[in-house]
Amino acid sequence: MKKTGYFLLAVIVIVAAAGVGYWKFSGNPDALREIVLERCLPDQLQHQNPAPCAEVKPRAGYVIFKDRHGPLQYLLMPTYRINGTESPLLLEPATPNFFWLAWQARGYMSKKYGHDIPDSAVSLAINSRLGRSQDHLHIHISCIRPDVREQLDNDLTRISTRWLPLPGDLMGHEYLARRVTESELAQRSPFMMLAEEVPEARDHMGRYALAVVRQSDDSFVLLATERNLLTLNRASAEEIQDHSCAILSSR
């Protein structure tokens, strides 16, 4: 029985890994990088036109791009080569605080929507190495799922200033949660907080996905989930988002 159990476990892991691999490589993983480096950046530098991006900031090192999925979803991407959460560059002090820059760009959602979107409806997310389809770092700026919003509201007083397991998980997956102030988020990258504060995370950053959500007390919640093929968790923090923005119709 024990051998049979181990065999079944191995089969599950292999099937899960194969499924993730197919999902990841079934498209062009360099599509976003090509848009940034071959179109948006050259057009901005040569013609002062960011198209097809919404904004290009060469000196600050990032672009804002309207994603085709969802009416209000935008992406923040670097203007140079960074693959994703596994990149050592994200732990360098000179690297821009991409999450903070993404939060500052949330106004594009309101502009596209035609009305002010409350901060409580906005979320930021980046997927892990196996949880993404593109090999150019991109932070999703989009609406939060209404059920995730409700859960985080209910857990407001239970979320610590240290990385601790989020009560009840999220979307059936285990998450770590940490509360930070706006000042902390502005001054220190969530990538660094994860690498420096969660044991062994620094050596395995590519396994992690991260998300940032504003709370009703004006603090922020950092969320991190680690890849776990046994639980079919490919670490895609984008799962907390709803690109159809149903939360706006309920307000």
UniProtKB/Swiss-Prot annotation:
It is an enzyme of class 3 (hydrolase). It catalyses: a CDP-1,2-diacyl-sn-glycerol + H2O = a 1,2-diacyl-sn-glycero-3-phosphate + CMP + 2 H(+). Keywords: Cell inner membrane, Cell membrane, Hydrolase, Lipid biosynthesis, Lipid metabolism, Membrane, Phospholipid biosynthesis, Phospholipid metabolism, Transmembrane, Transmembrane helix. The keyword Lipid metabolism applies. InterPro entries: CDP-diacylglyc_Pase (IPR003763), CDP-diacylglyc_Pase_proteobac (IPR015993), HIT-like_sf (IPR036265). Its EC number is 3.6.1.26. GO terms for cellular component: plasma membrane. It is a single-pass membrane protein. Pathway: Phospholipid metabolism; CDP-diacylglycerol degradation; phosphatidate from CDP-diacylglycerol: step 1/1. It is found in: Cell inner membrane. This is CDP-diacylglycerol pyrophosphatase.
